[in-house]
Amino acid sequence: MDPAEAVLQEKALKFMCSMPRSLWLGCSSLADSMPSLRCLYNPGTGALTAFQNSSEREDCNNGEPPRKIIPEKNSLRQTYNSCARLCLNQETVCLASTAMKTENCVAKTKLANGTSSMIVPKQRKLSASYEKEKELCVKYFEQWSESDQVEFVEHLISQMCHYQHGHINSYLKPMLQRDFITALPARGLDHIAENILSYLDAKSLCAAELVCKEWYRVTSDGMLWKKLIERMVRTDSLWRGLAERRGWGQYLFKNKPPDGNAPPNSFYRALYPKIIQDIETIESNWRCGRHSLQRIHCRSETSKGVYCLQYDDQKIVSGLRDNTIKIWDKNTLECKRILTGHTGSVLCLQYDERVIITGSSDSTVRVWDVNTGEMLNTLIHHCEAVLHLRFNNGMMVTCSKDRSIAVWDMASPTDITLRRVLVGHRAAVNVVDFDDKYIVSASGDRTIKVWNTSTCEFVRTLNGHKRGIACLQYRDRLVVSGSSDNTIRLWDIECGACLRVLEGHEELVRCIRFDNKRIVSGAYDGKIKVWDLVAALDPRAPAGTLCLRTLVEHSGRVFRLQFDEFQIVSSSHDDTILIWDFLNDPAAQAEPPRSPSRTYTYISR
């Protein structure tokens, strides 16, 4: 660097150091804007390209001896004005020239056409009075008001070149930054620092720990890894299920005990990548078809076949062809209770924390106490087999082989009244589903009909299947249906458009369920297929990539299935119930543990 520029730069920095912090921001913003107003440094020539329409400049001192800055006897403002004039008026003396004499300020090189010029860095002689004048200038500077100081420094910066602006800007930037995470605990505000960091995701939290010892202490004392895991468990069913199945949920959502006998932050930090590894393993198992399998043999004495089922973590409730409802312990796979009363096959069922409601080929709907197995109510309305039913929030919808749909009001298990009968299908209504907005029904007449839930008025018909429709699920705007034309169709319920046709089953698609990630279907060909729902909703995805895996274990028609993030539970004409576990794959457990490949990038869908 040119010696003269070095001296000027040093002087400017010392002025900055003498300024109060409240002035730095204004000076930094000015320095940021100056490159577009002043000149650019040309590294190829070592020269400064001026953007000013200036003629050949004269020596700043005009050959005169350096002038001394003498304190005014008037007000501080007069002192400021006097010094500013000395520093900024080329006709008197600039601050740089009084501090550092120059012999040649500008050397101008004319080009052939004489229209442009290059300014060569100034060559200066150091003044013997530099230190004295600098101290005097700083003394005046300290006496001025903040607004006068800012104005003076702005004028000073405006006289500098592009390189000096950049250097001053880089000098000021660290001064304008504050480590608030370190500063807050010093003022007794640890909880605020912890709360700020608690919004970080895992990757950012890991990086925050490495900033410094104080950040690591805040992260550790605030138990931020524990809070991150708790946040994921509250908002994501996959994490919630893992907490229950792996047992680490017992360490969450508890205040630190008085004796301090609780897992440290390091326990939760080490737990997080293990959870991510479990999630990756589950996803990989779904895609590759790796699973452990448990089989329940229903051992029906007369007619064999399990037509319907529903499960939770403790039990499986199944409806059988032999007219019974059997309740199984999900852990021991033993039959805990058998409910009898129907005189025909149990074709459909649903239960909640209070009741089990079943529909049968005997044309009745029966209500049972889920805890005692006592029959509480019998509804007689349909004149043929009740093929499907759904209930929720005090409302039940049933459908029948008699081509009708019945809408019921449920005040209590013993007080269920018929509200409305919906007609319009020209064949047996095989399946219904509903939410607060729509009732959706599918029939052997090849159509799906949509009805208004509140008014029970008809809304629209979805056409597309070439044969009767056997199964359906509806959620949000999406309807997924399976048909005896061996296809699965995805529909937008609002506009009635068919979004995708899935082909792959060889016989009637008898049952279908979907969640946010995948569709699982079962068919009369004895196969269960897993489909990528996200890809299926993308019109650019090739049809051949949509089926992730085909599972073949049943020896008869697949009648019903249900699934969650960890498992599929299915029933079949072969009189068995199969539990397909994608979390606890024996082959994967035999392998040595591996590091998760996306330890801090899990995204919930």
From Swiss-Prot:
Per UniProt, subcellular location reads as: Cytoplasm; Nucleus
Tell me the segments the record calls region Homodimerization domain D. Answer: 128-177
Key words, A-Z? Biological rhythms, Cytoplasm, Host-virus interaction, Ligase, Nucleus, Repeat, Ubl conjugation, Ubl conjugation pathway, WD repeat, Wnt signaling pathway
Instruction: Note the PROSITE patterns from the entry.
Output: FBOX (PS50181), WD_REPEATS_1 (PS00678), WD_REPEATS_2 (PS50082), WD_REPEATS_REGION (PS50294)
GO terms under cellular component: cytoplasm; cytosol; nucleoplasm; SCF ubiquitin ligase complex
- Main localization (coarse): cytoplasm
Protein's recorded name: F-box/WD repeat-containing protein 1A
Organism whose genome encodes this protein: Homo sapiens (Human)
